[in-house]
């Protein structure tokens, strides 16, 4: 499982780690978190998160990465089977589209600004915002079937290719402008 975001409270990374702890006994689940860690608040949050991972005994299941280059980020997306964005009050996350472009299905909250990219059961799933139980159930549902993950990943890639590439946006805008001229 891969997640991306700044190391800050609203990203709900403690909740995500707790979900991994709950699922670790049933699934060979591992989590990689890649985040920005450039100011003191983020560094403090990162330190608390690292301590939490250690106290939970999850050092072999959770990796915390900081300030990755684009090449390093792409390598992490390529390794992922599932992308989870546990954030609350997320206006719009480009990381979901990035994951989908790498054929990785996505899980995000139902109030996420980019939840509109997720078609339930087609390219990912939604969970109830800020609800650990809902997040755990949603991730567990995704983990139950490798075939389902693969198919949702394929669907995610197709959706990005067909709906969210710049050329398609441009063509849609031009079509609208041409309609206005008439």
Regions found by a protein language model. Give the residues of each.
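Nucleotide-activated donor-binding/catalytic signature segment of Leloir-type glycosyltransferases, i.e.
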Residues: 46-68
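Short alpha-helical donor nucleotide-sugar binding micro-motif in glycosyltransferases
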Residues: 67, 75-80
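Glycosyltransferase donor-sugar binding loop
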Residues: 30-50
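Aromatic "clamp/platform" in nucleotide-sugar-dependent glycosyltransferases that forms part
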Residues: 88
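Conserved donor-binding/catalytic core segment of Leloir-type glycosyltransferases
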Residues: 1-11, 17-20, 32
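Short hydrophobic beta-strand element within catalytic cores of glycosyltransferases
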Residues: 105-108, 118
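A short, well-ordered alpha-helix in the C-terminal region of glycosyltransferases
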Residues: 134, 141, 148-163, 169-175
């Amino acid at each position: 499982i891969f997640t991306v975001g700044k190391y800050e409270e609203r990203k709900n990374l403690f909740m995500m780690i707790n979900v991994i702890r709950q699922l670790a006994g049933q699934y060979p689940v591992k989590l990689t978190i890649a985040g920005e860690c450039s100011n003191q608040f983020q560094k403090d949050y990162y330190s608390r998160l690292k301590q939490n991972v250690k106290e939970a005994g999850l050092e072999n299941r959770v990796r915390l990465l900081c300030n990755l280059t684009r090449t390093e980020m792409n390598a992490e997306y390529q390794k992922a089977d599932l992308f989870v964005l546990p954030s609350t009050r997320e206006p719009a996350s480009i990381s979901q589209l990035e994951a989908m472009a790498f054929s990785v299905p996505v899980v995000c909250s139902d109030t996420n600004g980019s939840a509109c990219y997720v078609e339930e059961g087609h390219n990912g799933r939604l969970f109830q915002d800020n609800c650990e139980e809902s997040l755990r159930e949603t991730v567990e549902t995704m983990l139950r079937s490798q075939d389902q993950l693969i198919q949702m990943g394929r669907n995610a890639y197709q959706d990005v290719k067909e709906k969210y590439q710049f050329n398609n946006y441009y063509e849609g805008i031009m079509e609208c402008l041409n309609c206005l001229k008439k």
